[in-house]
Amino acid sequence: MQAIKCVVVGDGAVGKTCLLISYTTNAFPGEYIPTVFDNYSANVMVDGKPVNLGLWDTAGQEDYDRLRPLSYPQTDVFLICFSLVSPASFENVRAKWYPEVRHHCPNTPIILVGTKLDLRDDKDTIEKLKEKKLTPITYPQGLAMAKEIGAVKYLECSALTQRGLKTVFDEAIRAVLCPPPVKKRKRKCLLL
């Protein structure tokens, strides 16, 4: 059985741990608990192939900036997460997470994941953002960011309702099992 190491990164409180707990136990956890590395392992079937999916949680807080990369070696796929209702966490995909991941693992596939999908249409959440002159992140914005950072896929999910949750991990596995073809630059020799 093929083993795949999937590391989840992103700002603190975007829902990385909830994503993993909800996926592995089918239950949404209660209050917020900041993480320092938890590992989960799940045997799953994707496209008829059995896979041992090793899920590595990380702490997004700056205090762990020097410790976090210790979990990066031998990673097969990264999930870079941001909250759809936190524009700051979305901006940090470009400013922090993509550069950090690429620095340590230049060729590892990335899946960009927008979390807390259930809150994007939540009236109270929209109102709180509006007070700060902010709005939730839209699907096209997420897609554009994924293209900008060269992510294999852009996906949105809710750990609370589990909408889109299984797809995130299925696509992470597919990114490893069926990597997209590398576009070769055609070298043309021009004589003038």
Swiss-Prot record:
Glycosylation-annotated residues? Y32, T35
| Sequence positions bearing (Microbial infection) O-AMP-threonine | T35
So what EC number does this one have? 3.6.5.2
Write out the residue ranges of the motif Effector region.
32-40
Q: Lipidated positions for S-geranylgeranyl cysteine?
A: C189
Q: Which residues carry this modification: Cysteine methyl ester?
A: C189
Per the UniProt entry, the effect of T17N is:
Constitutively inactivated. Abolishes interaction with PARD6 proteins. No effect on NR3C2 transcriptional activity. No interaction with PPP5C. Doesn't activate PPP5C phosphatase activity and translocate PPP5C to the plasma membrane
Per the record, lipidation of type (Microbial infection) N6-palmitoyl lysine is found at K183, K184
- Expressing tissues: Isoform B is predominantly identified in skin and epithelial tissues from the intestinal tract. Its expression is elevated in colorectal tumors at various stages of neoplastic progression, as compared to their respective adjacent tissues.
Q: What is the effect of changing C18Y?
A: In MRD48; decreased substrate adhesion-dependent cell spreading; dominant-negative effect; reduced neuronal proliferation
Q: What is the effect of changing S71A?
A: Loss of AKT-mediated phosphorylation and FBXL19-induced polyubiquitination
Summarizing the annotation, the consequence of altering K184A is: Slightly decreased palmitoylation by the V.cholerae toxin RtxA
**Residue positions of the PTM (Microbial infection) O-AMP-tyrosine?**
Y32
Q: Which residues form the propeptide?
A: 190-192
Q: Where is this motif: Polybasic region?
A: 179-188
Specify the effect of N39S. Answer: In MRD48; decreased substrate adhesion-dependent cell spreading; dominant-negative effect; reduced neuronal proliferation
The organism's superkingdom is given as Eukaryota
The membrane topology noted for this protein in its Swiss-Prot or TrEMBL record is: Lipid-anchor
Keywords of the record, alphabetical order, are: Cell membrane, Cell projection, Cytoplasm, Disease variant, Glycoprotein, GTP-binding, Hydrolase, Intellectual disability, Isopeptide bond, Lipoprotein, Membrane, Methylation, Nucleotide-binding, Nucleus, Palmitate, Phosphoprotein, Prenylation, Synapse, Ubl conjugation
Name of the protein in question:
Ras-related C3 botulinum toxin substrate 1
Gene (name only): RAC1
